[in-house]
Amino acid sequence: MAEVEKVREKEVEKEVERKEIEREEDVEVCPECGSPRLIRDYRRGEFICQDCGLVIEDTYIDAGPEWRAFDSEQRDKRSRVGAPVTYTIHDKGLSTIIDWSNKDYYGKAISVRNRAQLFRLRKWQRRIRISNATERNLAFALSELDRMASALGLPKSVRETAAVIYRKAVEKNLIRGRSIEGVVAAALYAACRQAGVPRTLDEIATYSRVDRKEIGRTYRFITRELGLKLMPTSPADYIPRFCAALGLSGEVQKKAIEIIKKAEERELTSGRGPTGVAAAALYVASILLGERRTQREVAEVAGVTEVTIRNRYKELAEKLGIEIIL
């Protein structure tokens, strides 16, 4: 009887888990504010509304592999199943490899006589996978892209978009005369803006091997040549990330976004850096809701100076009629 009950409990747990997954997949808008701007934070395992900051799901289980790989060869070697097509690998993940286990299909050990031949086959198979200059370029560039995206904590969708942008740049021969690292960084910056999870040029440059000036110049070039239509970044897009870094509540996040929307309606954000406006709005919101953070703390997270925050928050308070008691 005890065994039957255990089996039944496991079945109930599986059913509950299945329903939870179905419920999450059915969520298309925020149940709190009705916004469709939902984003999954893989680093913290959360499903979040970008507008009001509601955490819709905070126990997201990563369905990916339990192992880590630092290049495509290592990834292929450790994988136990066929992967889906992806633009983040130079051959889109369609090629195969000869395993190093030295065993045949039935699990029997390969004879000593045939191992030397198998070694040569592996060597040539690796060479065939990257057979020309374009493939070598893609292999290096996409591994660099993966490294930077991991360091920045970007989701898979942004990596795929950045890989597609880079591939288009290669097809149109826009790489000539420019460093691969610079074009990769520019493609990643464009993908972040396109996906609504912006990173500043300074943040991209921190993890890139090129400076901020080159990334900006290359970004303007590829967006013009590829005809990418990218809307200006809204300060509100930075709020969820800054809020999380400062340990502020969802109420503060909601209030900061509300302040930014009012500022945009009155055109107070025109000609001003979005990170500076976002930092100032967050600083004001934290004071209004009793979760005060210092200007230095906010400045460090936002990557701006304390002077910028002081100028922006005074401007917002004056033009929007917000009374701040310091």
UniProtKB/Swiss-Prot annotation:
It comes from the Archaea. The keyword Zinc-finger applies. Sequence repeats lie at residues 143-226, 237-318. Keywords: Metal-binding, Repeat, Transcription, Transcription regulation, Zinc, Zinc-finger. Zn(2+) binds at residues 30, 33, 49, 52. One of its GO terms (cellular component) is transcription preinitiation complex. InterPro entries: Cyclin-like_dom, Cyclin-like_sf, TFIIB, TFIIB_arc, TFIIB_CS, TFIIB_cyclin, Znf_TFIIB. GO terms for biological process: transcription preinitiation complex assembly. Gene3D superfamilies: 1.10.472.170, Cyclin-like. Transmembrane segments: none annotated. Stabilizes TBP binding to an archaeal box-A promoter. Also responsible for recruiting RNA polymerase II to the pre-initiation complex (DNA-TBP-TFIIB). This is Transcription initiation factor IIB. It comes from Archaeoglobus fulgidus (strain ATCC 49558 / DSM 4304 / JCM 9628 / NBRC 100126 / VC-16). The lineage of its organism: Archaea, Methanobacteriati, Methanobacteriota, Archaeoglobi, Archaeoglobales. The gene is tfb.
